[in-house]
Amino acid sequence: EYDLSYPKDGWVELNVEDVLRTVRETVKSVLSNNLEIEACGITNQRETTVVWSKSTGEAIYPAIVWQDRRTHKYCNNLKLEGHEETIRNKTGLVLDPYFSATKIKWILDNVNGARDKAEEGDLLFGTIDTFLIYKLTGHQNHFTDVTNASRTMLFNIHTLEWDKELLQLFDIPKSMLPEVLSCDGNFGNLNVNNTNIPIRGVIGDQQLSLIHISEPTRLSTLS
């Protein structure tokens, strides 16, 4: 469990470095058992949003957690402007603050200098899986999987690509977004304590729970 902060009514934030530190400690603990590990995987709460600097590797704002409702007025305005059906048709999602798109936009619009840095190509976005992959591969790989991408409200579930029209609607540079791989893709190698363990599975927590029900003894993931 991680400590959440509630700076204002309806706001929910998380220090993503706490997550990274816990994951590193967990990996070190597992490695201390001298197990023969062929590969590892990552599962996560899907919509929680992190924006960080490519040049420093540090988050420019605390992670905005999936429960956060700070963008509800903006979402309501988009509904009044008639964008809800387009978003639903492209993403399969309702227009709601729950998802990542409006969280990213809020950070770009409210963190000093963020939009300029994004336009310059210095800012990266990811859900928790993407941030962990980036940090645990030594800032090498900026990837996510389809289950996490599908919860951003920016991913077209028919083309399986980031949607240009939605990126324009939310005013988010495509350069911020990770490359989308299948859940069993090659996400790079885990670099902790001089190990080189392949990361060969990334999936959202709710999707993983379905697999876990059918094969409960076979799964061990970073969560």
Label each PLM-derived region with a short phrase.
Residues 141, 146-214, 218:
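ATP-dependent carbohydrate kinase catalytic cores
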Residues 220-223:
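Serine residues within intrinsically disordered or low-complexity segments
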Residues 25-38, 111-118, 164-174:
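Phosphate/pyrophosphate-binding loops at sites that engage ATP/ADP/AMP, CoA/4′-phosphopantetheine
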Residues 53-56, 136-140:
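Short acidic-glycine loop/turn motifs at beta-strand connectors
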Residues 1-61, 89, 179-182, 195-198:
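N-terminal glycine/serine-rich phosphate-binding loop of ATP-dependent small-molecule kinases
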Residues 67-112, 152-169:
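Glycine-rich phosphate-binding loop plus the immediately following alpha-helix
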Residues 14, 39-45, 64-67, 92-99, ...:
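Active-site nucleophile and cofactor-binding loops and adjacent substrate-binding regions
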